[in-house]
Structure formats: C-alpha cells, structure tokens
Amino acid sequence: MSEPTVNFHIQTRLTEFKIPTELIKKNFKAVQKQIEKQKKSIGEDVAKVKKNNKLPTAMKIEMINKLIKSFEIFQKRLRTSINRDEVFRSRIIARLENLSELANYTVKTNVVLESNASPIDSDDNRDESSVTPKSMEDEDRPLDLHNVNLINWYRDQTNLLIIDYLIKSNTRSDQNIGLQLLKSISQTNPKFTKLIDYDLYDNFNKVFVSIIENHDLSLVIAWFNENRSFLKKANSNLEFEINYCKFLSLIEEGDVNEAIKFSQVNLSPYGNKGNYQSQEFMNHESNLNKLKEIGGLLVYMAINEKANAQIDKSIPFSSSLVINSPRFKEYKKLLSNERWDSLSQCFIENFTKLYGISRNYPLFIYLSAGLSSLKTKSCYCNTENTIFKQYEESSESNKNIYKKDLAVLTDKKYRGPNKYYKLLNKINHCPVCSPELYKLSKNLPYAQLITSIFNNPFKLPNGNIYPFDKLLNPSEKYLSEKNTLLRMGKIKDPLTREIFLIDDCVRVYPA
C-alpha cells in the first residue's frame, strides 16, 4: 500500500521518543547518586555526633542544624530532579497523543460492510483467529489526505521539522532563530514545546558553535565531564581531541613551556597502546600519528618565528630549505582550522550516539525521500545545461557552507534544463531541478517509474514523447493543417509547435 497509514507514521517517528527516554534514565541515575551521596554524608555526620560523647550540647545542636540545612538543600535538589522527570514524561505523553490523533483521520472503509453484515457472521459463529483487533485495523487504514484536520496536522509536523533544522544549524552565539520561531508558534499552539527537545538541541548547538566558530573548549569540556561514564563505555576519542586542540592552542598563543607540560600530563598516555582496549586500536593508531607530529611542530614554530624576525634580512640557506619543504607546510597545516572541524565532528558523533538519533537533519531525510520519488534522468542532467557545472566549480573554490554566495542558486533563470521552457516563455518549477534543492537531490537515486501512461509512444527529435495517435489525430482546430503535413510526411509537436519528418521520429519503450 503506497498511501501513508498510522503505522507508517509511528515507525518514522520512533526517534522522537528516544531522547526523552534517555533523559529520564540519565536523570534517574543522577537522583540515585544524590541519594547515595546524601545518605553517606548524613551517616558520617551522625556517627561523629554519637562517637564524641564529650562534645558540648551547643556544638551538638550546631552540628544537627547543619545536618538539617544540608538535608533541606538535598530536598530542593531532589524536587528539581522530580520536576525535570515530570517534564520529560509529559513530552512522551504529548507525542503519543499527537500520533493518536491520526486514528481520527483515516479513511472509513468498513462502515458500509459492518452495516450490511449478514446475521450468519455473528460473534458466536465467527472464527476468533481471523478477527483483527480494531486498534490494529485503524493503524493499517490509509489516511484521508483530503481531511482538513490531517492537512493541519501535517503543517504542524512541517513546522517542527523546520524548527529542528534551524535550532541545530544555527551559527550565531547571540541568538537562535529556531528558538525564536518556536516561541512565536507556541503562543498559539502551546503543545509545540513538548513535541521537540528544543533545550537539548540548543545546548548541542551552543557547544558546536563554541567549537567551530569561537574556538572555545569550555562548553565541550563541561559536556564531556557530564557524560564521562557513557563516553568511556562507548570508547569515545573525544577527550583526546579536546586535549589535542588545547595543546595546539597553547602553541599558537606562544606558551610553549605550558604546552610541553600539558602534553606530558594529558597527551603522552595516549601514545601507550596498553592504555587502550582491544576495540580502540583504530583510535590508538590515529592518535599516535598526531602525537608524532607534535615534536616537529615545536621545531616548526622556532624556525617560523626566526624567519618572521628576519623579514628584512637574509634567511640562512638551511632555514630556507626547511621553510620551503612540503613537510614544513604540513606542520603549518596543523595550526589551521582543521583541528576544530575534527573536534566538532567527533562531538557530533558522540552526541548522536548518546541519544540514538540520526546525524542527518530529519527535514533533509523527508525531503530526500520526496525528491527521489520525483527525480528522473531528465532532471538537470541535460548536457546542454551548464549552470550546474558552473555551480560545482564555484562550490569547490569555496567549501565553507556558511559563507557561500547563494546568489547564483536562487536566480530563477538558472533553474533546470530550460530548453523547451524558453520556447513557452515559462520557468521549470521542478523541485529536483530547483536551485534550493539541487545540492540535496544531486546524489539521490532516480525514481523507478516502470509504468508508461502513453500508448505506442514516439520520441520526436526535440526529445518530447507523445502517443502516436495524438500526433496523427490532433484537435479539430489543426485538422486541415494536419492533413497537409501528413501528405508531406511531417507532424507537429503539440506543445512547442515544431514540425518534424515522421521518419525522424523513434518508437520508444519506457522502462
């Protein structure tokens, strides 16, 4: 069945329940630790009071008051954790209710059958094994795509996908346009805040922006410490990437002595294979290769500083050879932004693994599914259309996705293969060919359209395909012209009005 059903939407939205579930587990473990810590602390303090019988009564009262205050603080923390747990559970309930609404928008196909059922098909005579539960029947029914409420439901889901994308892809540290959009929509639809884990995504985006834009390690270090136990079990390499970036930052700032001390404590252990588990040998090889370059980097910095100091003077021949060597340029590359890209990708990988979510934007996943069902071999693959080749060349020269000039892509004159559209003074509105979706649809598979809507199709020299009957029997308006053309062995394209010889037409067999 090609029509969407309730079951289809349940399957595609399972990831929406993973994050709240993981947050509940995480919060529960934190509460357990708080209780154990408080229990141990109170036990030790009470033991001290009991053990010292010679303590003055005033001091004992003071110690007991401290115990009461610490317990009150513990109660506040516990209440905060309980409230947090209730928020996470309310999100799961809201998402279940949101999916449950779909049961009201299905096509009612069994109403007539039930009313016309014969008396023989009574409950007593019916085979129980053949009876399907009503809930399962509702879930397998196709959705009524003409239902206004269902259209509004889809519109809400589209807004959620857009908000999700905007929050995650934000590149500004001062504001997040995705959160602003969510706040605006939630004023009229308060349930929106429970249908998306905006706070977690906002925290993710802040850490990512702090790494890739601000080159700041404080937020990613805090996130690592918060999730240290999971990352250790997952054999994460994030700690090494953080320490490696910290070391290179110290080198870049010129604090060589501090960098050497830092590397001895925080980087040297990663060179020992015995500190890795059997599943981490790939991390060991990668880390070891990076550590080998550290010593040469110090030499590079010394030679580079000396060369900069002697700009107006002649550089020694030996130093000149080193500076112009390919290996020297490799050390220079270590201090580029590649290290921050590597750290950001490592953070994304660990974040998605922690919460069991996809690294791709859900909006892109849905768009890809729709585009691949529309994509044909005629889409922007016409060899006469060179605009996309020009785009590829310009994109290779500037790979930064945030700073790329999109003026070329948004100009309507650059849309798709417009060979025939120009003749009609129209624009190609194919979404696959559109500049906005070109990059996303570029590597998608073609749609497998195995059914031809034409009877006895023929291809004209201009590439257009029509049923041969339509070419021989045009409308009454062009009947006299048709007879004249046929006597000359010619036919006219109904769309472009171009005239071709019948012998130049080719019988095609669409696959």
UniProtKB/Swiss-Prot annotation:
Q: What segment(s) does the record annotate as region Disordered?
A: 117-140
Q: Which molecular-function annotation in GO is an example for this chain?
A: ubiquitin protein ligase activity
Q: What's a single GO BP term from this record?
A: negative regulation of gluconeogenesis
Question: Per the database record, which ranges form the CTLH domain?
Answer: 200-258
Positions of the zinc fingers (RING-Gid-type)?
A: 430-496
The UniProt entry's GO CC annotations, sorted and at most eight, read: cytoplasm; GID complex; nucleus
Subcellular compartments: Cytoplasm; Nucleus
Q: Which PANTHER family match?
A: E3 UBIQUITIN-PROTEIN TRANSFERASE MAEA (PTHR12170:SF2), MACROPHAGE ERYTHROBLAST ATTACHER-RELATED (PTHR12170)
UniProt protein name: Protein FYV10
Gene of this entry:
FYV10
